[in-house]
Amino acid sequence: MDNNVDTITLTDEEGKETEFEVITKLDIEDKEYVVVVPKNEEVDEAIALRIDNNDNGEEMLVPVEEDEEFNMVAEAYELLFSEE
């Protein structure tokens, strides 16, 4: 995924599209993640997504659902923004 992407549009299971603002991209243990928040919505929580490749080699975003993986991304995110 390009580091200069500011927004992405994701489609849920029901076909509803939502635009998200990309807060940051993180490289952790040979995996790439993006942290996003819904654009134009009052939300306090960010969403962590892992960048994977599908069978065709195209990038796809996968929600981080495992607690251990989520905690690792959250820790890296907090460390990054505590340094600013």
UniProtKB/Swiss-Prot annotation:
Q: Where is the signal peptide?
A: none
Cross-referenced InterPro entries:
UPF0473 (IPR009711)
Query: Which Pfam families would you find in this protein's record?
Result: DUF1292
Superkingdom field: Bacteria
- Similarity remark: Belongs to the UPF0473 family.
* Name this protein carries in UniProt: UPF0473 protein CLJ_B2791
UniProt organism field: Clostridium botulinum (strain 657 / Type Ba4)
What is this organism's lineage?
Answer: Bacteria, Bacillati, Bacillota, Clostridia, Eubacteriales
